[in-house]
């Protein structure tokens, strides 16, 4: 059985590696939820379920990033924001221009 061309054994081993290193990750970054998102009267179950969903989302993001690397492919380079690059170039040229 495979998931997107990757065997379940490979996914499981990386997932276990992820769980093994979980203690090194700050939980606030992993869950990335803020307590102010919940009212004081919310039951604890809802907070735990929401945190679990966010944790699973982080795991799936981790697997999504890992998938092309396991297949031997490199990830796509992010597209450069051409407008930002143009503005940066204009500022650079105006800064380097002579004051004449």
Curated annotation (Swiss-Prot):
The keyword Mitochondrion applies. One of its GO terms (cellular component) is mitochondrion. Its main location: mitochondrion. Residues 1-45 form a transit peptide. Keywords: Mitochondrion, Transit peptide. It is found in: Mitochondrion. This is Uncharacterized protein YNL198C, mitochondrial. It comes from Saccharomyces cerevisiae (strain ATCC 204508 / S288c).
